[in-house]
Amino acid sequence: MEVSQSQLDLKIKYLKLKRINELNDKLRDELQRERITASNACLQLIAYTTSTRDYALPTLWGYPPADTNHFRDFQTQHADDATCCTIM
């Protein structure tokens, strides 16, 4: 009985050590992650939204050039069709 109790104690100590080592590894990984302040993140977000054109807001950015809108080309090619779908 004494031998099994000591083995059990060793196993518990090993599991505790393993859990502590896993937590230590997670904390090391978190320390290596790049961090920026909230104000810098806001500035980066503002810079992105003011420099990237979003044609979903035509009042702000206007409409895309005609040669870049492939949906417009598809519409003009099939405008004379009276059907709603094409069977291939």
UniProtKB/Swiss-Prot annotation:
An example molecular function term from Gene Ontology annotations: G-protein beta-subunit binding
Keywords recorded for this protein, A-Z: Lipoprotein, Membrane, Methylation, Palmitate, Prenylation, Transducer
Designated name of the protein: Guanine nucleotide-binding protein subunit gamma
PANTHER family: GUANINE NUCLEOTIDE-BINDING PROTEIN SUBUNIT GAMMA
Modified residues (Cysteine methyl ester): C85
UniProt GO cellular component terms: Cdc24p-Far1p-Gbetagamma complex; G-protein beta/gamma-subunit complex; heterotrimeric G-protein complex
Prosequence residues removed at maturation: 86-88
Lineage: Eukaryota, Fungi, Dikarya, Ascomycota, Saccharomycotina
Localization in the cell: Membrane
Residues where lipid is bound covalently (S-farnesyl cysteine): C85
Record text on subunit structure and interactions: G proteins are composed of 3 units, alpha, beta and gamma.
Family the entry assigns: Belongs to the G protein gamma family.
Bilayer disposition of the protein: Peripheral membrane protein
Gene Ontology annotations of biological process type: G protein-coupled receptor signaling pathway; pheromone-dependent signal transduction involved in conjugation with cellular fusion
First-listed, main subcellular location of the protein, grouped into a coarse class: membrane
Top-rank taxon: Eukaryota
Source organism (scientific name): Candida glabrata (strain ATCC 2001 / BCRC 20586 / JCM 3761 / NBRC 0622 / NRRL Y-65 / CBS 138)
Lipid-binding residues (covalent, S-palmitoyl cysteine): C84
Any Pfam family matching the protein: G-gamma
SMART domains: G_gamma (SM01224), GGL (SM00224)
